Amino acid sequence: HLGRRVEISLILPSANLHEALNNHDKEYYQHRTEHFPLVIGLCGFGDNRKAWINNTTIESLCEKNHFAACFINGENKWYLNLGPIDNHYDFLEEDLLDYLYGNFKNLSPEAPLFVIGVSMGGYGALYHYLTNVEKYDGCVALSPATKPDFIDESKFGTLQSHFLKQKEKDLHVFLSIGEKDFIIGPSREFNTFLKENHVGVEYRFVPGADHSWTFWEKEII
């Protein structure tokens, strides 16, 4: 759906020290049958997939909690189908997941699937979750951009409209933003909308925090 080769970053939990010292199977990973929960991580505008690994302790979290994480580049396209060879929505929902489930035996559609994003990636995480509620087990959106000015709402809808479509369902969404964030105004308005429409989802507002990895790292721990 992107018409080109792309790079991803994938973290799979390894054997812990006890397992490694007591395991003599040279094909341990080939024989391992455990299915890990999978987290798809979406970066912000102007950033790339490596930001997650460079700015957070996500690798150690994967090891400690036994879950896998995959990070992709957003290429400033908001994780939407902006075509003709920039169909990032279909890439994530079809190409990426098919590749992961088809090539790594410890990843399976039967295991829990989550999507997490920061800033532009927060928008993407919400959009993908709300349009695929049956597929995802949860969504984390940190400092999400909730109303991009140049998104064609007649084509993609608004996040508000997608929340209203799904409000009767048991939504598992975590929203968080710092009170010093430059998009705090629209975020407060969005939170008011969520409360007034009884969506069952509300923001966590964090005093002193801004729009940065320093804040986002603390939120994912």
Regions found by a protein language model. Name each.
Residues H1-I221:
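Non-catalytic cap/lid and distal C-terminal segments of serine-dependent acyl enzymes
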